């Protein structure tokens, strides 16, 4: 009781780490004993009912987070009813290693405007903390990894608690914080940011094997990002093994070279105190030299094994035997596992010492499975505690059977005091941390480039140039980015007018301009620029689009991000694209050039499968227009679609357009003759729905050619040739195979639940055809993109497309080789089987 009273320092609003340390120095031995003694669960609350000590409360909450994270997983695997088909899992060991550093962050260090990406395998810890903060329900925790329950990995879109950044594909959430910091810098430089916050990633050390982290690290250095923390849970175990020794020095040098501060939190207070005693220096040297595998094995074996190994290795050195003899086996194990990442005081000291905006990486030494019987074992990643082990832990934590979910059960501080403490935690604001942003007005039409012959890529550049000339809200809120292909994707005109962004106010002189060397590029870099130039790293592109595409929610200021890249290199960043869509980030992806129509460039730069990726990606509407007027219509719609955020859908919205999403535009450098035509409301709607009749079929027509994108000229010529034999044949322009297909599936689902009058756009388009009509589909992509059209009404399909890797050649040569030329289309039309 007397030891406990030592923690009674100040009222919650007046307490501080500095006061605590002064007090601890005066009563060091008693404080040390209290810090590492088991609390008596049957004792009366030891703090007065008026205020509570900060450190004691943090340590109590830390223990509760550990228990809850274990119990959440145990309940999901052993107590909740299941079909028994699959193990539920949940990563108890990975969660345990990060309990202290997460508790220090959320219960003390973070402020409401800070944003956090939590390592995927620590999601039970995150959910437990949110539960204690009042942001998560007991029902959600009990449903962990079940339908409608707390998610296996933190999810912005699936979880009900306060997730800032989704994580799951390791490494991407880490990079996301860097690009979110860049977006915050962008908003700040443009005068739109409100209160700045830190972008924080809690990182599993095995995530540092992910290459995308270093791509992001280098890009962050180029842009001089600020207010960025990466907290490494340095438990030195990956999924399969114990990691290599001596990596930390290499990590530290790498981060230092990128302008980061590196803070290593290696020892807890117990170890620091032991080092100050006779024999302590020898102990420190032994720990520093101990291989990770040996240390992990000793952690698992426990105190007796520690004693034997230490005496064998350094027992002959001065003071060591006396130092080790001071501890019984349990205390020795506690000492040897008292790493910095498991010491609340050490973590608080490290966090609170940083008061500037320099990017900082904390390496917090931890033990995978700390505090659990799984600790240190090399097989613990997927390991689960047995029911008997969990029951022993329950008793040790003083938790009454049946009260396992109670927030403050078993803690030595009165519930009312802990509740008051939690309510006054700086991070635990009652204000919504997800912001709303007013929509950006979009003009009723976008100017269509007037060229009689152009490509969709050229048209895109001219449309953006036209927007750039207008000093309206739309132009101001567009931000563009590209991985070193700004010019070759026709963004150059936009950048000439709107400039490059860099937070530095000092501009680099254009020596070409000063030397009177002519160049089309007049790019000026400034804090007011609207183009973010990236290196050739597609992961960075998609994660930046994710961060910018969530600016309205993260920072309360809406941006309309446009990213450009070569279409085939979507594959290089596909996981990051998936990550962006999974979070419901809003952006326009312009992929150009595309297909084998990029003829001389050869197979390495030609794409065929990307339209299938667009069709398969939730939250992403994929278009492939043929003409400039179609592109203008689609781009205008896209700016509104990015901003749509309806929670519920009105009847008839088969595509969920009222909910909004992102857009993928697959464009081409192939120039084709443009069509002069009025764009009435009906045609505009059909372009957006995904298709329209360029040449309508006669009623009962027996032949249709359906084309997509740049295959329009070949399809037109083939259609002209076929109408001599089949005058009623139709020519279907597909602007979005994705939206036609999604609408068709949605209509089928609606009819299955009784909405029998529901029809899809493609069903209405194909309705005039004869039941035995033949469909010939043509696309500069895999034939499966359009071959499904035959399933709509059970009609025969001859699907033309690209199934092999491309190669260099002229357009006519490649179209003939891959059977996309006029003759091949006509031949397909003539086939009857």
Language model features: what each stretch is:
Residues 199, 204-207, 234, 366, ...:
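Active-site metal-binding loops of divalent metal-dependent hydrolases
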Residues 201-202, 208, 576-595:
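A structural-propensity feature for long, helix-poor, extended segments
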Residues 53-65, 69, 73-81, 92-223, ...:
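Cofactor-binding active-site loop characterized by glycine-rich and histidine/acidic residues
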Residues 4-7, 11-15, 19-21:
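Intrinsically disordered, low-complexity segments enriched in serine/proline and basic residues
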Residues 62-67, 114, 416-573, 577-585, ...:
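Non-catalytic terminal/interface segments that mediate subunit docking, oligomerization
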Residues 146-163, 182, 186-196, 214-404, ...:
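Thiamine diphosphate
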Residues 50-58, 80-89, 111-114, 159-167, ...:
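Glycine- and acidic
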